Amino acid sequence: MAAVETRVCETAGCSSEAKLQCPTCLKLGIQGSYFCSQECFKGSWATHKLLHKKAKDEKAKREVSSWTLEGDINTNPWSGYRYTGKLRPHYPLTPTRPVPSYIQRPDYADHPLGMSESEQALKGTSQIKILSPEDIEGMRVVCRLAREVLDVAAMMVKAGVTTEEIDHAVHLACIARNCYPSPLNYYNFPKSCCTSVNEVICHGIPDRRPLQEGDIVNVDITVYRNGYHGDLNETFYVGEVDEGAKRLVQTTYECLMQAIDAVKPGVRYRELGNIIQKHAQANGFSVVRSYCGHGIHKLFHTAPNVPHYAKNKAVGVMKPGHVFTIEPMICEGGWQDETWPDGWTAVTRDGKRSAQFEHTLLVTDTGCEILTRRLDSIRPHFMSQ
């Protein structure tokens, strides 16, 4: 850290004299960021590093703004980045969509860094909340609405449609149901849903790329209503797909459903990964290890942590009133991942395809209730494509 003129330490609760400044902030041109010691700097790192991400994102937006011609698409916005597969981003992104003021917003919606202070307050805890009857009813309502929004997205999936157009439909469907699209501005995520095509594992940002015949695409929906979040996703075929894609998507769905069949009071959360990996490996596929299922209710992400791979160290035992997601990400090749320079798009390191399915579940006295199930069919959409 570089020495600078005397200032007051920016760590919350510390008013000591500060002569050190974050070197990364200096490089990025961020003003301020003064600390009294390495210890204070390290103690503030979890929130401070978000300033770096925001500055990098704003720099990227400034670069994007230089593309002024209508229809001018940049498929290589990050000079020097080596893509792992054939997929490319299609920039610029459209502007952030507004949410009417009458719709209730989560605490991160208007935070400059998109940070959820309520989640940060419980970060690191392994205590799993048991929902009250009132909470459970709130979750039933919001999960039903999330399902309706995903069903709207499902009708959009076809060759020639851009993932940006799917995101637009999702955004409008949320507003029509008096819901806030939970991904929007969550740690500055720029869109209202995630769309993950082919080698994208998760957290793909909707953009101007048209879906192509033979693609697979996952659409991940979370909505917020009356203080609760509901979360689900499905993977879809785009037109006719090859047999490898069919096997991958079918196996991924089976991994989810076999894990759901095991959910009941007394089961350890770590057991779900054993079930998922056994079925994936039996079919020649691998299980992503970097991203997990999670508790969800008034918080978007909270305890329990639900890994999908075998021999994990997840903490906790299922009890009636627990609500959480299972969302296995299954890959054709290796499970290793990397992230695009946008800070969100997770892709397979070998460029091979990945699929995912997700439900939000309530542990009952005898088993579980799939809160995000389809009401008009027991089959996921891909089985009817």
UniProtKB/Swiss-Prot annotation:
Residue ranges that the Swiss-Prot or TrEMBL entry lists as coiled coil: none
Compartment list: Cytoplasm
CDD domains: MetAP1
Catalytic activity: Release of N-terminal amino acids, preferentially methionine, from peptides and arylamides
Binding site for Zn(2+) 4: 231, 294, 327, 358
InterPro entries: Creatinase/aminopeptidase-like (IPR036005), Pept_M24 (IPR000994), Pept_M24_MAP (IPR001714), Pept_M24A_MAP1 (IPR002467), Zfn-C6H2 (IPR031615)
Binding site for a protein: 203, 301
Broad enzyme group: hydrolase
Binding-site positions, Zn(2+) 1: 9, 14, 36, 40
Main location: cytoplasm
Binding residues annotated for Zn(2+) 3, in chain numbering: 220, 231, 358
Keywords: Aminopeptidase, Cytoplasm, Hydrolase, Metal-binding, Protease, Zinc, Zinc-finger
Ribonucleoprotein listed as a keyword: no
Positions with a binding annotation for Zn(2+) 2: 22, 25, 48, 52
An individual GO BP term: proteolysis
GO cellular component: a single term: cytosolic ribosome
Molecular function (Gene Ontology), one example: metalloaminopeptidase activity
Zinc finger C6H2-type: from-to: 6-59
Cross-referenced PANTHER family: METHIONINE AMINOPEPTIDASE, METHIONINE AMINOPEPTIDASE 1
Function, in words: Cotranslationally removes the N-terminal methionine from nascent proteins. The N-terminal methionine is often cleaved when the second residue in the primary sequence is small and uncharged (Met-Ala-, Cys, Gly, Pro, Ser, Thr, or Val).
Family listed: Belongs to the peptidase M24A family. Methionine aminopeptidase type 1 subfamily.
Protein name: Methionine aminopeptidase 1
